[in-house]
């Protein structure tokens, strides 16, 4: 099921007087873009995430991926993501929420004053534990700018999915779910790995995904009205199909579906996807037709959009272009001296 097409007015024009090099430096990968006159001229990528860069070698890696771009006069380099973590180039302390783009731009960690800056992450205090974001804040700023919004609810699915609420241009709340990492562990490193396909599905299987999703969305049974069907050992409680969902039990069900040859290994990968995403989404509440901005890869957009529509929400999808737009928003804020 495709996400709904909604027409928005053209996004606000970005005005930046300086050449901009935007760098999205993750744990295992590195992406960079040259932006001139608010347009992406060229993109480059490598597998030199922060975990593969030796201490003190970050300047060399940056020079390698940017090469001729550094020759532009008065070029501004903005770096987001894990380069600002304790394991990265230099620590860029978290900014505690609530945070505006102006506050964020005013608290860049400058490696070279007004030449090379690292965008700080965000932190928030929840009742049970603090939560943090590094890198997604740039994507959020870009998504809002592209859609001409200053208030929105967003989900950024990935290894660690982020749910973010922005009101009047201020990051008010966010929460993190280890959905992608949990899925990967179950698929590749648990007992399920013996029965699931080792490769990713070639295409989205909505039927399989819905089967996993429904395991979480089923309602709690009315025990008083439970009836027994069948006779002897074949008796079954009809309410079992409406039992209270339990993650640990449902995960094992993926294995037994394979043991009894109910579905093939490829099918069960999408069942598992639906299951873990369903548990993530059940922590959220949605108004009918509420717009939820989904920022992520094409594959993750498909999974989350389908699930959100099942729950009555209206997903709006954006990809990697939101990252580069977010860096431009920060650069414009710096450029205009309104940080």
What are these language model-derived features?
Residues 177, 185-223, 227, 232-273:
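Active-site rim beta-loop-alpha module in soluble metabolic enzymes
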Residues 20-24, 76-78, 152-156, 293-294:
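Short glycine-aspartate micro-motif
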Residues 29, 289-307:
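Glycine-rich phosphate-binding loops at beta-strand->alpha-helix junctions
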């Amino acid at each position: 099921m495709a996400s709904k097409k909604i027409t928005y007015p053209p996004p606000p024009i970005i005005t930046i007087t300086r050449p901009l090099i935007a760098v999205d430096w993750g744990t295992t990968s590195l992406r960079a873009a040259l932006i001139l006159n608010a347009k992406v001229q060229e993109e480059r990528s490598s597998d030199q995430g922060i975990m593969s860069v030796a201490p003190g070698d970050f300047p060399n890696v940056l020079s390698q991926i940017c090469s001729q771009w550094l020759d532009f006069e008065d070029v501004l380099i903005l770096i987001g993501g894990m380069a600002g973590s304790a394991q990265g180039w230099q620590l860029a302390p978290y900014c505690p929420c609530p945070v505006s783009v102006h506050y964020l731009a005013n608290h860049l960690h400058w490696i070279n004053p007004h030449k090379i800056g690292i965008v700080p992450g965000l932190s928030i205090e929840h009742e049970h534990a603090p939560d943090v974001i590094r890198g997604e804040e740039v994507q959020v700023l870009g998504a809002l700018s592209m859609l001409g919004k200053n208030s929105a609810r967003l989900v950024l699915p990935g290894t660690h999915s982020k749910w973010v609420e922005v009101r009047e241009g201020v990051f008010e709340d966010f929460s993190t779910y280890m959905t992608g990492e949990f899925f990967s562990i179950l698929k590749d490193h648990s007992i399920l790995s013996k029965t699931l396909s080792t490769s990713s599905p070639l295409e989205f299987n909505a039927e399989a995904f819905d089967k996993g999703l429904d395991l979480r969305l089923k309602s709690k049974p009315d025990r008083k009205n439970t009836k027994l069907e069948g006779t002897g050992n074949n008796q079954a409680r009809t309410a079992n199909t409406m039992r209270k969902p339990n993650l640990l039990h449902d995960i094992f069900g993926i294995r037994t579906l394979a043991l009894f040859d109910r579905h093939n290994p490829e099918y069960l990968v999408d069942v598992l996807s639906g299951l873990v995403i369903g548990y993530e989404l059940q922590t959220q509440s949605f108004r009918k037709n509420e717009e939820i901005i989904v920022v992520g890869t094409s594959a993750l957009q498909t999974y989350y959009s389908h699930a959100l529509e099942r729950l009555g929400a209206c997903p709006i999808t954006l990809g990697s272009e939101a990252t580069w737009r977010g860096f431009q928003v920060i650069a414009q804020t710096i450029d205009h001296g309104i940080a």
